[in-house]
A protein has these predicted regions:
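Membrane-water interface segments at the C-terminal ends of transmembrane alpha-helices
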Residues: 1-70, 85-109, 114-116, 140-159, ...
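Short hydrophobic, aromatic-rich alpha-helical segments embedded in or entering the lipid bilayer
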Residues: 27-28, 119-130, 263-277, 434-448
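C-terminal transmembrane helix and the adjacent membrane-cytosol boundary/short C-terminal tail
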Residues: 63-77, 84, 141-220, 317, ...
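Short, conserved glycine- and acidic-residue-centered signature motifs
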Residues: 116, 120, 265, 354, ...
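Conserved adenine-binding aromatic site and its adjacent loop/helix in ATP-hydrolyzing domains
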Residues: 125, 129, 252, 287, ...
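A detector for short, charged/polar N-terminal pre-domain segments
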Residues: 221-227
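Compact recognition or signaling/catalytic modules
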Residues: 391-393, 408, 420, 438
Length: 492
């Protein structure tokens, strides 16, 4: 379900362009089935934008919804009505997922620009056009302020009117009052004797629903028997929707045809040879790798230090500072790109590795903060106090005790930072030129001019690199876990 999050946004956009074009697979299938007489206009309009953005943002909705469902006792689903019991308990997660998707969609640039074109112009596209093409900084800045104000207004209204907030991250538990005591809402799942928010019930929620008449019990049994089948079909459809476009692009990268065609008439490596034989593609790839490594190092260091300060410093302003540090994750990326472009134009650094890496670090650092702070909040600080009581200094105690415990989270944050930089295209459009583009910028220019099959090979390589980085990150986590397990065994 989350694999598309690790796949390049340009790869997914390119996949939908191939699928939805007039000679694409969707129109071919519909025509072969006799459902349409002429190709449907599925791309370069609002429909194409909706399909592409749904594909991209669906995993962001799944995360908070899944987290909310995990807190509900499965016995409630078996014994109670879905709409009366399960849905009300998971409603906060559903609302948070919807709010997150809405906020992210407000400032999206890549999908509308590629799949919408002139048929679906968004405010993010207007900002990019005013600043990079028309050089109208005043109007472009005004649109940027209007966009960020709209995002803040939506967040404020959702919190004030409905109590809906974006998913909380950072690993901090939310206390819940029950019966005059404070319990940790993250420690105990909702069960049959507890309602969300901590209110105790006189009897389990499931109890009255178990005492049913035989006729109603039989109908209930039939619905339960049919439920898993429909759920399986729905889940399968979602997986196909998320993974099929990527799989089709990978398949077409091995095609022997001279143009995009599915199914491929034969297998060939010609498009991979074209990629590796092109100095422009190789230079763009090496430049992206260089920037991604610099971003990973800088983002990991800054994000880890920020997480330590947020978790360990007890002050009333910590929560507000946490929101400020995470703002690049929520703010429309076109706003960040515009601000970075305005800064580096004055510093005369546009086009340099330093400028691009610095801008990417702004985007990558919040991911490291989220990952490391979640792990650091679970570490018992008394372990460091004990070490300091035995004569260790504060720095040595942290490095010897806490740092090894959060090292897997730091490694995961580094992976996030690397992939965030390697896949980034919006800032690259502002800070790089056509002479020395990054790989995403090179792909953007190629997609804008023509759907060259070489792009399918490049997309496959980017997917493979993302999978490789994920495997390296997972292997490092396993190694750290085994290392510390062995160290504890030796100590005992």
């Amino acid at each position: 379900m989350l694999f598309p999050l690790w796949t390049s946004l340009l790869v997914r956009s390119y996949a939908w362009m191939v699928l939805l074009q007039r000679t694409g697979i969707v129109n071919q299938v519909l025509g072969d089935l006799g459902l349409i007489a002429a190709p449907l206009p599925l791309v370069y309009n609002e429909l194409g934008v909706v399909i592409g953005m749904t594909h991209v943002l669906l995993p962001f909705a799944v995360l908070p919804i899944y987290a909310g469902m995990r807190q509900v006792d499965p016995a409630l689903l078996r014994a109670g009505h879905f709409f009366r019991v399960f849905l009300p308990l998971t409603a906060p997660g559903v609302a948070a997922g919807a709010l997150l998707v809405f906020v992210l969609a407000m400032g999206y640039f890549v999908i509308p620009a590629l799949l919408g074109g002139r048929g679906a112009i968004t405010i993010a596209m207007l900002i990019e056009r005013q600043i990079t093409m028309l050089l109208n900084w005043g109007f472009g800045s005004a649109l940027s302020v209007l966009l960020i104000a709209s995002v803040l207004l939506v967040l404020g209204l959702a919190t004030w009117l409905a109590g809906v907030r974006l998913p909380e991250v950072g690993g901090r538990s939310r206390p819940v009052a029950t019966g005059g005591q404070v319990e940790d809402a993250d420690e105990k799942p909702l069960d049959g004797t507890r309602w969300q928010g901590g209110a105790r019930l006189e009897q389990p929620v499931a109890a009255p629903m178990l005492r049913r008449r035989p006729g109603r019990a039989r109908r209930r049994w039939l619905r339960c028997a049919a439920g898993p089948a429909w759920l399986g079909i729905a889940a399968g459809a979602v997986y196909v929707f998320l993974l099929a476009p990527i799989a089709l692009v990978v398949a077409m990268s091995f095609s022997s045809s001279q143009y995009l065609r599915f199914p491929p008439p034969g297998l060939s490596l010609q498009w991979f040879r074209a990629y590796f034989g092109s100095a422009e593609w190789i230079d763009a790839t090496l430049l992206s790798l260089e920037i991604a490594v610099v971003t990973m190092i800088a983002g990991t260091v800054l994000g880890t230090l920020g997480a330590i300060g947020l978790v360990r410093v007890r002050h009333w302003s910590t929560r507000a500072l946490y929101g400020v540090l995470l703002s690049p994750m929520i703010a429309p990326q076109i706003i960040t790109a515009t601000a970075c472009y305005a800064l580096f134009v004055k510093l005369r650094l546009v086009g340099s590795v330093v400028a691009i890496a610095a801008a990417h670090t702004v985007l990558a650092t919040p991911f490291v903060i989220v990952t490391v702070s979640s792990a650091l909040a679970q570490v018992d600080e008394r372990l460091e106090w004990a070490a300091r009581g035995l004569g260790m200094g504060p720095l040595r105690a942290f490095v010897s005790i806490t740092a090894p415990l959060i090292m897997p989270a730091i490694a995961s944050g580094a992976v996030f930072a690397f992939i965030t930089s390697f896949d980034e295209v919006v800032i690259a459009l502002f800070l790089t030129g056509t002479a020395h583009p990054t790989l995403p910028r090179k792909m953007w220019d190629a997609v804008a001019m023509q759907l060259d099959p070489t792009l399918a090979a490049v997309s496959t390589i980017m997917v493979a690199m993302s999978v490789l980085v994920l495997l390296i990150g997972q292997a490092s986590r396993v190694w750290f876990d085994r290392y510390h397990t062995a160290a504890r065994s030796d100590a005992v």
